[in-house]
Curated annotation (Swiss-Prot):
One matching Pfam family: Ribosomal_S24e
Gene that produces this protein: rps24e
Coiled-coil stretches: none
GO cellular component: ribonucleoprotein complex; ribosome
Family, per entry: Belongs to the eukaryotic ribosomal protein eS24 family.
Protein source organism: Pyrobaculum aerophilum (strain ATCC 51768 / DSM 7523 / JCM 9630 / CIP 104966 / NBRC 100827 / IM2)
UniProt cross-references to PANTHER family, sorted A to Z: 40S RIBOSOMAL PROTEIN S24
Keyword Protein transport: no
Record's keyword annotation contains Ribonucleoprotein: yes
Gene Ontology biological process terms, A to Z: translation
UniProt keywords, alphabetically: Ribonucleoprotein, Ribosomal protein
GO molecular function, one term: structural constituent of ribosome
SUPFAM superfamilies: Ribosomal proteins S24e, L23 and L15e
Name of the protein: Small ribosomal subunit protein eS24
Length: 121
């Protein structure tokens, strides 16, 4: 059983990017830093939205305090998030699907490099 408790410290509305930017505090005395997945699940449950619209940008733990602060972006639509969020953030938050996106991007990058090399010759 996990002894974590979460609290939303700050909410900022970013209408230009169609998202809410949250600062979430996680208190986890005598336990490890909470996972991205657990933070995503808690935020989605609290706001009553789909977990696919929630992306954890960073979790910063204060040394020796048993407290972490997480930066979370909550989008109105997951399609907007896939355009705006960097690929590495998508990969960290989406698990297997994110790894596939990362592999596809690497493949495209390598194809462009090969094409550029052939063009130089």
């Amino acid at each position: 059983m996990s002894a974590e408790s979460f609290n939303i410290v700050h909410i900022r509305e970013n209408k230009l990017l169609a998202r809410r930017e949250l600062l979430v505090e996680a208190v986890h005395q005598n336990a490890s830093t909470p996972t991205r997945q657990s933070v995503r699940e808690w935020v989605a449950k609290q706001l009553g939205i789909d977990i696919s619209n929630v992306f954890v940008r960073r979790i910063k733990t204060e040394f020796g305090r048993g407290r972490s602060l997480a930066e979370v972006h909550v989008y109105n639509d997951s399609k907007i998030a896939r355009v705006i969020e960097p690929l590495y953030i998508l990969a960290r938050n989406l698990g297997e699907e994110g790894k596939k996106l990362l592999e596809e991007a690497k493949k495209r990058r390598n194809e462009r490099r090969e094409k550029k090399k052939r063009k130089k010759k």
